[in-house]
């Protein structure tokens, strides 16, 4: 029973979602030349770091989790694991993850993990989430770290491809998170968390969602235009982006139930990002040695 609780507090769903993006970044950089030992070490290292961050987040959010319907039954809220033990557990997970990335991958991968961790735990969870409407924006940077870590574990350098991945996943996080904040509006309001829908209203949030999806669309296409991914990826990226944008625009119809609309937008956001992760894993080369930007220039 205790094993289940120690697993639950690491938020396995979040770990799994992050691993899909790590795989996408790793295989994009590997271009078919896969070092399986490095691959497994990177997946395990990132899993441990993400798990650590989630446990720290659960520890920090104990007070507000009690006020939210979605989180009131979490392990630490119910006292199934003591706060002191959770801190030790989170620390051990983090140290193990950072050490594995440093020793089995490279220092860059580890430092990217450290930066993502510090932003999520130190900046977002401890301060921005509770104090600022821009908390989601800051948190999006940590959410974009896993695919970049996967990419840099192979490349051992932060190049244009890594930057594009950072942009894609950061921009994706915003509509994804805002959609959650809309259909969980009462939860965030009850916990006094200053997310955009609560502070500025759902109407303003819809405009932000639309703009971020347009930005996401441009960023996804850049992966092919810059010569990192192929045309099959491009077709899928364009298709899911246009469809997601269309769903966002549906939110402006007055007859729509905002919560139902936001939940659908949230679900499709997961489909969209996983589709891109899969496609960049398998379609990592363009047919020509030159990329499209060369021709456009």
Swiss-Prot record:
One of its GO terms (cellular component) is plasma membrane. Keywords: Cell inner membrane, Cell membrane, Heme biosynthesis, Membrane, Transferase, Transmembrane, Transmembrane helix. Its EC number is 2.5.1.141. One of its GO terms (molecular function) is protoheme IX farnesyltransferase activity. It is a multi-pass membrane protein. The chain crosses the membrane at residues 12-32, 36-56, 85-105, 108-128, 133-153, 163-183, 209-229, 230-250, 266-286. One of its GO terms (biological process) is heme O biosynthetic process. PROSITE patterns: UBIA. It is found in: Cell inner membrane. InterPro entries: Protohaem_IX_farnesylTrfase, UbiA_prenyltransferase, UbiA_prenylTrfase_CS, UbiA_sf. Pathway: Porphyrin-containing compound metabolism; heme O biosynthesis; heme O from protoheme: step 1/1. Belongs to the UbiA prenyltransferase family. Protoheme IX farnesyltransferase subfamily. Converts heme B (protoheme IX) to heme O by substitution of the vinyl group on carbon 2 of heme B porphyrin ring with a hydroxyethyl farnesyl side group. This is Protoheme IX farnesyltransferase. It comes from Sodalis glossinidius (strain morsitans).
